[in-house]
């Protein structure tokens, strides 16, 4: 909500399972907060033009614009928002990190609010990778680029298996599975604890906002 008042929401989503899950979450949040969906658009398959949606945004002035179209959709959205001079109070997106949004579009991407699984600045620690900042530095030194969240979660998965094997004291499938199910630990990536369905219910998503220095030469 905006100062305790319901907000007007515009949204545009790709038609894949992930983006549609995000859409359902927005619909649920709108219902809970009494907010109103004023634009509910499908992104084109090519993800190369969302001018039609942005024209509606300019005409209706929503409080929030939510876009989920993976890497290409994120890049297209920021490019066309800048080109069409769309002024929206809040821009919320997925896949900002995968799109390297701040590097690709610089100042044009400033203030975009991004959902992510992980960020190097989080305070989680472990005894192997230490913390996010250390992991980021070590990964970048080894591979020549900053780690995406997929690399971080894969590294954390190795720690989970290591811990499970040590507790199981066996390679027996059932014993290892039972050990995995009983996992309750912290890694540099976040806390790990599984629900009955196998989902990690202990680590929340994070939000970060793209910010730039005064002249726009550096954004992150």
Where on the chain are the PLM-derived regions?
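Extracellular/periplasmic catalytic domains that process cell-envelope and extracellular macromolecules
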Residues: 3-4, 58-60, 83-85, 104-108, ...
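Segments of small-molecule ligand-sensing domains
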Residues: 138-151, 160-219
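Conserved beta-strand scaffold positions in the cores of enzyme catalytic domains, especially
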Residues: 37-42, 112-114, 207
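Residue-level signal for short, function-critical loop segments
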Residues: 13-16, 118, 164, 213
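Phosphate- and divalent-cation-binding pockets in alpha/beta enzyme and binding domains
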Residues: 21, 76, 100-101, 160
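Extracellular/periplasmic periplasmic-binding protein-like sensory domains
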Residues: 78-155
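Extracellular/periplasmic Venus flytrap/periplasmic-binding protein
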Residues: 1-85, 125-130, 153
């Amino acid at each position: 909500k905006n100062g305790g008042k319901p907000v007007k929401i515009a949204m545009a989503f790709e038609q894949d399972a992930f983006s549609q899950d995000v859409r359902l979450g927005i619909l649920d949040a709108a219902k809970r907060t009494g907010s109103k969906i004023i634009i509910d658009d499908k992104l084109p398959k090519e993800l190369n033009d969302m001018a039609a949606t942005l024209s509606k945004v300019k005409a209706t002035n929503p409080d929030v614009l939510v876009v989920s179209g993976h890497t290409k959709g994120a890049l297209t959205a920021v490019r066309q928002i800048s080109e069409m001079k769309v002024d929206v109070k809040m821009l919320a997106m997925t896949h900002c990190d995968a799109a390297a949004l701040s590097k690709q579009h610089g100042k044009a991407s400033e203030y975009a609010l991004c959902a992510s699984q992980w960020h190097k600045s989080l305070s989680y620690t472990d005894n192997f990778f230490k913390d996010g900042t250390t992991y980021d530095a070590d990964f970048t030194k080894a591979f020549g680029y900053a780690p995406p969240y997929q690399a971080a979660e894969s590294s954390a998965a190795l720690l989970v298996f290591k811990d499970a094997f040590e507790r199981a004291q066996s390679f027996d499938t059932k014993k290892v599975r039972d050990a995995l199910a009983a996992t309750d630990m912290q890694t540099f990536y976040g806390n790990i604890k599984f629900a009955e369905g196998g989902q990690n219910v202990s680590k929340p998503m994070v939000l970060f906002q793209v910010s730039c220095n005064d002249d726009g030469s550096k954004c992150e």
